[in-house]
């Protein structure tokens, strides 16, 4: 809506708009395919039993959309007619890096689930051998890129939104919902497996290591 309210959108406005659309479309298709195949989203199994917990998750998702896209929306609506500069290209590089990491890690996880039983086996190959949550690493990097692209179109206090957006994504995924939930589920399923204990001890939560973990599948 913000983009189509403009009379003469700049190149940066168009890039921000298209990147948000691509991100939302890709994520929507991915989640639909996963839930359609599994019949549920196990992350919310326990929460659905308690109304206020489930409401909290939905409120968190709504806040996530607003805060993560905040910098992009303000940049699109900004009267500053910014041109593509070096900082914008840095942001574009970060966005594509994060997007590709997220897409590849989601694909690797999906292929693993098609050939393995996730209730007894865990993925530790590919990008998942370098990070326990490479998809979240990609998501955070993607939004850092969006914030950097937005900088050229922001001014004054608006710069704060460029910082708030990726910081909010980080805390939501790493401290509040994503990682804590998935780590708890993984610990319950595989906590007694020595291979899982070794994997968790030697593989960072987000940041990649220079050497991948053992490429042999751990079960």
Per-region residue spans from a language model:
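Cytosolic, membrane-interface loops and tails of multi-pass inner-membrane proteins
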Residues: 33-49, 107-128, 183-207
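Transmembrane alpha-helical segments that form the membrane-embedded catalytic/substrate-channel core
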Residues: 21-37, 67, 93-112, 165-186
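Interfacial transmembrane-helix boundary/kink motif in multi-pass membrane proteins
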Residues: 11, 15, 42-60, 86-89
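Conserved small/polar residues in nucleotide/adenosyl-binding loops
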Residues: 208-213, 217
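Helix-coil boundary and interhelical linker segments in multi-pass alpha-helical membrane proteins
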Residues: 1-18, 69-91, 148-161
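Core segments of transmembrane alpha-helices
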Residues: 58-73, 135-147
């Amino acid at each position: 809506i913000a983009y189509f309210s403009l009379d003469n959108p700049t190149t940066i406005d168009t890039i921000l708009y298209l990147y948000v659309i691509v991100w939302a479309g890709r994520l929507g298709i991915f989640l639909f395919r996963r839930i359609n195949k599994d019949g549920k989203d196990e992350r919310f199994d326990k929460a659905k039993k308690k109304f206020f917990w489930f409401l909290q998750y939905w409120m968190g998702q709504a806040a996530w959309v607003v805060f993560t896209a905040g910098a992009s929306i303000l940049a699109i609506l900004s009267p500053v007619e910014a041109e593509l500069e070096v900082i914008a290209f840095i942001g574009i590089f970060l966005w594509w890096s994060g997007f590709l990491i997220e897409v590849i890690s989601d694909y690797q996880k999906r292929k693993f689930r098609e050939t393995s039983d996730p209730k007894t086996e865990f993925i530790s190959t590919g990008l998942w051998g370098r990070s326990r949550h490479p998809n979240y690493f990609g998501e955070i990097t993607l939004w850092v890129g969006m914030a950097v692209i937005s900088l050229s179109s922001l001014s004054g206090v608006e710069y704060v939104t460029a910082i708030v957006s990726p910081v909010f994504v980080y805390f939501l995924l790493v401290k509040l919902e994503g990682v804590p939930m998935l780590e708890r589920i993984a610990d319950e399923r595989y906590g007694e497996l020595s291979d899982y204990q070794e994997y968790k001890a030697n593989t960072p939560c987000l940041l990649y290591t220079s050497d991948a973990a053992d490429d042999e599948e751990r079960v």
